[in-house]
Amino acid sequence: VYTMQLNLSGIGKGFCADEGTKILQDAGQKYGYYNLGASSMVLLSDPSHRDTGWSVSVTSPRYFSDSMSYATLRAHDIVLSTSGDYEQYYELEGTRYCHIVDPNTGYPIGAAPSQSGSYVVCATVIGGNAAAGDARATALCCMTLDEALSYSRAHSSEFKVLFVWYEALTNEYIAYSNLENWTLEE
């Protein structure tokens, strides 16, 4: 007997990050950072790097090199939210089935026959509040490349993004960002 359970708790960690930030700031906390399972992170000021902020590495969805990260950014007084197919998944007959279900297809992202295996494998949203960032990062993973680019550009004044698109036809990974202060790891 197989059992399956769906929940909509994808923004739960972001909501907790937002509420935790309020509590810490109300208590006078000005410095530091904290994360909730690495997918929701709050960066307050860094007293040792006041101008540049914290150095944050974004985990690589496929470990492109010896490094486990694919990008590094410097930031402070901001939230980051990440979604992707690389931590909660299984593979069956060469297809990856992850925990993010595309509401348009009913399949996990990248697994729908109509997608030809091309999809956003991970997305990080920087700015806004963490709950909205969690929702946006997950939504980006369910978009086509054109949709993700259009959405990111249309909302660039509200938040920044960093995402990786997997193109199955050419077996390439393409990183995109509208951030100014990030570096791609070689």
Where are these regions (language model features)?
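Mature catalytic core of soluble alpha/beta enzymes
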Residues: 1-186
